[in-house]
Regions:
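Conserved C-terminal structural/oligomerization subdomain of aldehyde/semialdehyde dehydrogenase
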Residues: 1, 52-55, 278, 332, ...
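Hydrophobic face of amphipathic alpha-helices that form TPR/SEL1-like repeat modules
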Residues: 1-49, 75
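Residue-level signal for inorganic ion chemistry
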Residues: 51, 89, 111, 133, ...
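Short, well-ordered beta-strand elements within core beta-sheets of diverse protein domains
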Residues: 53-60, 77-81, 168, 277-280, ...
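Glycine-rich loop-to-alpha-helix module at the N-terminal edge of alpha/beta enzyme cores
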Residues: 54-143
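Structural signal for hydrophobic packing residues in well-ordered secondary-structure cores
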Residues: 76, 80, 97-104, 115, ...
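Rossmann-like NAD(P) dinucleotide-binding subdomain of oxidoreductase/dehydrogenase enzymes
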Residues: 145-287, 412
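ALDH superfamily catalytic-core signature
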Residues: 251-392, 455
Length: 497
């Protein structure tokens, strides 16, 4: 279909992106080629900055999902990838990373158009995806076994082997980086893969699937089934999958886990968050303000680790909040592709309406809201950066994952009170401590119930750093050496001499 872009937006896109968008509607990518979906359902890809459709794709049916899983199973069982020398897998994945780097500008524009985030942020996302892919390419030749002490008539070893067919369901906020958290280690260790991106953001994943074929990844090793919730449900229910990795809401993660229980499929879940940033009076307040702003305004707050709760020493509350609001007013809210934009829209009208509703409920319950900027004069799904003060612990705005540019501020009286507030939600994905005292940083970090604690910084990710949550934020770790356990099985071999 011809992309229905607003003229101002069309002028911001490269000819390569426009050409790619003007192709016929995409369908599933199975066994090395694009297929015509067996479903008649077309899903529009919406530009969040204008509310206009830019292209469409065909939703994958349950039959398409079964075909993708079957292709992945055949590709695994015949060894076309798993039995290749580790050096070959490493070289192929490095070549794939090089191709992604060559097309980084195109993919970043697709990501910004699809998600609504500022182009500068989208470029960082693609850089992260490339870094993760290169990191795990190196792991293909680094997984080793051990010789186990045994009675002298026996030789016993333990070795790591690929699991088999891995599936991933990825979210709309960071489509390509989060796909790479799952796909890169899976392929490095010899597995095959089926990806189901969010129905709202398929463009970068679809582009990447084509790059896999160009890079020489054998047919059937990487498969893509775009679609909405029904497609994801079909994927989790399909026999023949050995591992499912899911990133998304806690509620959907629970559904994935229930479905996986029926087939005893291995699962890892990275779910919601309500991350606290604890600011003590002895902190570098200038740095802390910048850190709090980055933690909540990045990607318009649509981040699983968004630092959406500012827990601050009561003695510095007013001064800190006033300066934070002042700096936030300098942000430019606009279309993600516009050069001056540093805060974009939310991904959909539904997400915008949900965020606005939660803020309205907080106001009705007596909270004070500071709206820090005017909304752009267009049809996009914009919510202005919002600072909520005066909310009580336990209110929805303080407990629920808003997933928007909304910061709730809670004052504390002492360290124990700060920790009580910080740990007082169902979530435990990330947190931060801002303090000039090394002993306090260590002491507080130990007591925070979160998978990641940042101290005097926020949002630092790297391919080597394991990432995941506790409590309702899920289980399992991605990135770093932790992925070895998720994408390999340990085999013990005992030989009688």
């Amino acid at each position: 279909m011809t992309a229905q872009l607003a003229p101002a937006v069309r002028g911001l896109l490269s000819s390569s992106v426009l050409s790619w968008l003007d192709k016929p509607p995409l369908g599933p990518f199975i066994d090395g080629s694009w297929r015509t979906a067996r479903s008649d359902t077309l899903i529009d890809v919406i530009d969040p900055g204008t509310g206009l459709p830019v292209t469409a794709y065909a939703a994958s049916s349950a039959e398409d999902v079964a075909d993708a899983v079957a292709a992945a199973r055949t590709a695994f069982d015949d060894g076309r990838w798993s039995e290749q020398d580790p050096e070959v897998r490493e070289q192929t994945l490095r070549h794939l990373a090089d191709l992604l780097e060559q097309d980084a500008d195109v993919v970043a524009q697709l990501e910004a158009l699809d998600t609504g985030k500022p182009l500068a942020e989208a470029r960082l996302d693609i850089e992260e995806a490339i870094a993760v892919l290169r990191y795990y390419a190196g792991w293909a030749t680094k997984v080793e076994g051990t010789v186990i002490p045994a009675p002298r008539r026996f030789v016993a070893t333990s070795t790591r082997e690929a699991i088999g067919v891995c599936a991933a369901i990825t979210p709309w906020n960071y489509p390509l980086p989060i796909l790479m958290y799952k796909l890169a280690p899976a392929l490095a260790f010899g597995n095959t893969f089926v990806a189901k991106p969010s129905e709202q953001t398929v463009l970068s994943t679809a582009y990447f699937a084509q790059l896999c074929a160009t890079a020489g990844i054998p047919d059937g090793v990487v498969n893509l089934v775009p679609g909405a919730g029904a497609t994801g449900a079909a994927l989790t229910a399909t026999q023949g999958i050995d591992k499912i990795a899911f990133t998304g809401s806690t509620r959907t993660g629970q559904a994935v886990m229930r479905a996986a229980a029926d087939t005893l499929t291995k699962v890892s879940l990275e779910l919601g968050g309500k991350s606290p940033q604890l600011v003590f009076s002895d902190a570098d307040l200038d740095a802390a303000i910048d850190g709090v702003m980055g933690g909540i305004w990045t990607n318009a707050g649509q981040v699983c680790v968004a630092g959406s709760r500012l827990i601050i020493d009561r003695r510095i509350h007013d001064e800190f909040v006033a300066e934070l609001v002042s700096r936030t007013r300098r942000l430019n809210l606009g279309h993600g592709l516009a050069p001056a934009t540093n805060l974009g829209p939310l991904v959909s009208a539904a997400q915008r309406d949900r965020v606005v509703s939660l803020v309205d409920q907080a106001v009705a319950a007596g909270a004070h809201v500071e709206i820090t900027s005017e909304l752009p004069d267009d049809r996009g799904f914009f919510v202005a950066p919002t600072v909520v003060t005066g909310a009580r612990p336990g209110q929805s705005i303080e407990q629920e994952e808003v997933f928007g540019p909304v910061l709730t501020v809670l004052p504390f009286d002492d360290e124990d009170h700060a920790l009580q507030l910080a740990n007082g939600t169902d979530y435990g994905l990330a947190s931060a401590v801002w303090s000039g005292s090394a002993s306090r940083v260590h002491r507080v970090s130990r007591r925070l119930r979160a998978g990641t604690v940042w101290a005097n910084t926020y949002g630092v990710f790297h391919p080597t750093l394991p990432f995941g949550g506790v409590k309702a934020s899920g289980f399992g770790r991605e990135l770093g050496s932790a992925a070895v356990d998720h994408y390999t099985e340990l085999k013990t071999t005992v030989i009688d001499l």
